[in-house]
Protein backbone atom coordinates (compact mmCIF):
# COMPACT_ATOMS: atom_id res chain seq x y z
CA UNK A 1 0.00 0.00 0.00
CA UNK A 2 2.81 2.44 0.87
CA UNK A 3 4.55 1.50 -2.39
CA UNK A 4 1.39 2.37 -4.33
CA UNK A 5 1.10 5.72 -2.50
CA UNK A 6 4.74 6.54 -3.32
CA UNK A 7 4.14 5.73 -6.97
CA UNK A 8 1.06 7.97 -6.96
CA UNK A 9 3.09 10.87 -5.52
CA UNK A 10 5.87 10.25 -8.07
CA UNK A 11 3.36 10.46 -10.90
CA UNK A 12 1.84 13.63 -9.43
CA UNK A 13 5.32 15.17 -9.12
CA UNK A 14 6.12 14.31 -12.74
CA UNK A 15 2.83 15.84 -13.86
CA UNK A 16 3.60 19.00 -11.90
CA UNK A 17 7.09 19.25 -13.44
CA UNK A 18 5.77 18.75 -16.97
CA UNK A 19 3.10 21.41 -16.44
CA UNK A 20 5.67 23.79 -14.98
CA UNK A 21 8.02 23.22 -17.94
CA UNK A 22 5.15 23.79 -20.35
CA UNK A 23 3.99 27.02 -18.67
CA UNK A 24 7.28 28.52 -17.50
CA UNK A 25 9.57 27.61 -20.36
CA UNK A 26 7.89 26.59 -23.60
CA UNK A 27 4.98 29.05 -23.48
CA UNK A 28 7.32 31.94 -22.64
CA UNK A 29 9.76 30.92 -25.39
CA UNK A 30 6.91 30.82 -27.90
CA UNK A 31 5.69 34.24 -26.76
CA UNK A 32 9.21 35.68 -27.16
CA UNK A 33 9.50 34.24 -30.68
CA UNK A 34 6.14 35.75 -31.67
CA UNK A 35 7.15 39.12 -30.20
CA UNK A 36 10.43 39.11 -32.15
CA UNK A 37 8.58 38.10 -35.29
CA UNK A 38 6.12 40.99 -34.86
CA UNK A 39 8.99 43.48 -34.40
CA UNK A 40 10.69 42.29 -37.58
CA UNK A 41 7.43 42.41 -39.54
CA UNK A 42 7.03 46.05 -38.39
CA UNK A 43 10.54 46.80 -39.72
CA UNK A 44 9.67 45.11 -43.01
CA UNK A 45 6.61 47.36 -43.27
CA UNK A 46 8.72 50.48 -42.62
CA UNK A 47 11.33 49.51 -45.22
CA UNK A 48 8.62 48.68 -47.75
CA UNK A 49 7.04 52.11 -47.23
CA UNK A 50 10.46 53.76 -47.59
CA UNK A 51 11.08 51.84 -50.81
CA UNK A 52 7.72 52.98 -52.16
CA UNK A 53 8.48 56.62 -51.25
CA UNK A 54 11.89 56.49 -52.94
CA UNK A 55 10.37 55.00 -56.08
CA UNK A 56 7.76 57.77 -56.09
CA UNK A 57 10.49 60.42 -55.76
CA UNK A 58 12.38 58.84 -58.67
CA UNK A 59 9.24 58.88 -60.84
CA UNK A 60 8.54 62.57 -60.23
CA UNK A 61 12.09 63.56 -61.32
CA UNK A 62 12.70 66.55 -59.03
CA UNK A 63 16.16 67.51 -60.33
CA UNK A 64 16.93 71.06 -59.24
CA UNK A 65 13.61 71.37 -57.38
CA UNK A 66 12.82 71.27 -53.69
CA UNK A 67 10.84 68.36 -52.33
CA UNK A 68 8.05 69.32 -49.95
CA UNK A 69 6.99 66.62 -47.56
CA UNK A 70 5.49 65.89 -44.17
CA UNK A 71 7.86 64.49 -41.55
CA UNK A 72 6.72 62.38 -38.61
CA UNK A 73 8.29 63.85 -35.47
CA UNK A 74 6.99 60.96 -33.37
CA UNK A 75 3.64 59.88 -31.98
CA UNK A 76 2.05 60.68 -35.36
CA UNK A 77 2.89 64.38 -34.99
CA UNK A 78 3.82 65.75 -38.43
CA UNK A 79 5.40 68.95 -39.70
CA UNK A 80 6.08 70.36 -43.17
CA UNK A 81 9.61 69.92 -44.50
CA UNK A 82 11.44 71.17 -47.55
CA UNK A 83 14.29 69.06 -48.95
CA UNK A 84 16.62 71.11 -51.19
CA UNK A 85 18.37 68.08 -52.76
CA UNK A 86 16.02 65.07 -52.98
CA UNK A 87 18.61 63.03 -54.91
CA UNK A 88 20.22 61.88 -51.65
CA UNK A 89 18.68 60.30 -48.56
CA UNK A 90 19.79 59.37 -45.05
CA UNK A 91 18.72 55.94 -43.80
CA UNK A 92 19.00 54.62 -40.26
CA UNK A 93 21.09 51.46 -40.49
CA UNK A 94 21.00 50.55 -36.80
CA UNK A 95 22.66 51.38 -33.50
CA UNK A 96 21.90 55.08 -34.02
CA UNK A 97 23.90 55.34 -37.26
CA UNK A 98 22.62 56.96 -40.45
CA UNK A 99 24.14 56.52 -43.90
CA UNK A 100 23.73 58.92 -46.81
CA UNK A 101 22.70 57.15 -50.02
CA UNK A 102 21.76 58.15 -53.52
CA UNK A 103 18.23 57.02 -54.31
CA UNK A 104 19.42 54.03 -56.35
CA UNK A 105 21.91 53.03 -53.62
CA UNK A 106 19.12 53.31 -51.07
CA UNK A 107 16.88 51.01 -53.10
CA UNK A 108 19.70 48.49 -53.38
CA UNK A 109 20.30 48.65 -49.60
CA UNK A 110 16.58 48.29 -48.88
CA UNK A 111 16.29 45.21 -51.12
CA UNK A 112 19.15 43.53 -49.24
CA UNK A 113 17.73 44.58 -45.87
CA UNK A 114 14.26 43.27 -46.77
CA UNK A 115 15.75 39.92 -47.85
CA UNK A 116 17.66 39.69 -44.56
CA UNK A 117 14.58 40.60 -42.50
CA UNK A 118 12.42 38.10 -44.39
CA UNK A 119 15.02 35.39 -43.73
CA UNK A 120 14.84 36.28 -40.02
CA UNK A 121 11.03 36.04 -40.04
CA UNK A 122 11.23 32.64 -41.75
CA UNK A 123 13.77 31.39 -39.18
CA UNK A 124 11.58 32.58 -36.32
CA UNK A 125 8.62 30.80 -37.92
CA UNK A 126 10.63 27.56 -37.91
CA UNK A 127 11.63 28.19 -34.29
CA UNK A 128 7.96 28.68 -33.37
CA UNK A 129 7.06 25.41 -35.12
CA UNK A 130 9.75 23.57 -33.13
CA UNK A 131 8.51 25.04 -29.85
CA UNK A 132 4.92 24.07 -30.74
CA UNK A 133 6.11 20.53 -31.51
CA UNK A 134 7.83 20.37 -28.11
CA UNK A 135 4.65 21.63 -26.48
CA UNK A 136 2.66 18.90 -28.22
CA UNK A 137 5.17 16.31 -27.04
CA UNK A 138 4.95 17.53 -23.45
CA UNK A 139 1.15 17.59 -23.62
CA UNK A 140 1.21 14.01 -24.91
CA UNK A 141 3.44 13.03 -22.00
CA UNK A 142 1.07 14.74 -19.60
CA UNK A 143 -1.93 12.95 -21.06
CA UNK A 144 -0.11 9.65 -20.80
CA UNK A 145 0.87 10.28 -17.18
CA UNK A 146 -2.61 11.40 -16.28
CA UNK A 147 -4.06 8.40 -18.09
CA UNK A 148 -1.76 6.09 -16.14
CA UNK A 149 -2.72 7.88 -12.97
CA UNK A 150 -6.43 7.44 -13.71
CA UNK A 151 -5.84 3.81 -14.70
CA UNK A 152 -4.09 3.05 -11.40
CA UNK A 153 -7.04 4.58 -9.52
CA UNK A 154 -9.47 2.39 -11.46
CA UNK A 155 -7.45 -0.71 -10.68
CA UNK A 156 -7.59 -0.10 -6.94
CA UNK A 157 -11.05 1.37 -6.72
CA UNK A 158 -13.40 -0.46 -9.06
CA UNK A 159 -16.43 1.53 -10.06
UniProtKB/Swiss-Prot annotation:
GO molecular function: transcription corepressor activity
Gene3D superfamilies (UniProt xref): 1.10.287.370
Biological process annotations from GO: negative regulation of transcription by RNA polymerase II
Coiled coil residues, start to end: none
A Pfam family recorded for this sequence: Prefoldin
Family under the similarity heading: Belongs to the UXT family.
Record's protein name: Protein UXT homolog
Organism in which the protein naturally occurs: Nematostella vectensis
Amino acid sequence: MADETDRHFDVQEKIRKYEEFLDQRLAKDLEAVFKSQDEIVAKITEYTQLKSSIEQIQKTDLKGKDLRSRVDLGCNFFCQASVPDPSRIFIAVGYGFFVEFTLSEALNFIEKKLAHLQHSVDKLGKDAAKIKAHMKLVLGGLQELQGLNQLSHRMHYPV
